[in-house]
Amino acid sequence: MEALVYTFLLVSTLGILFFSIFFREPPKVPTQK
């Protein structure tokens, strides 16, 4: 159980960092709709 909790915390931290950088610096790739 502890390994699962640590993995969840690690993934959540990486996700928050990724989203913060992604929304702060939007990609320069033009979106095709």
From Swiss-Prot:
GO cellular component, one term: chloroplast thylakoid membrane
Membrane topology (UniProt): Single-pass membrane protein
Localisation: Plastid, Chloroplast thylakoid membrane
BP GO annotations: photosynthesis
InterPro entries named among the record's database cross-references: PSII_PsbT, PSII_PsbT_sf
HAMAP family the UniProt entry points to: PSII_PsbT
Function: Found at the monomer-monomer interface of the photosystem II (PS II) dimer, plays a role in assembly and dimerization of PSII. PSII is a light-driven water plastoquinone oxidoreductase, using light energy to abstract electrons from H(2)O, generating a proton gradient subsequently used for ATP formation.
Family statement: Belongs to the PsbT family.
Name the record gives this protein: Photosystem II reaction center protein T
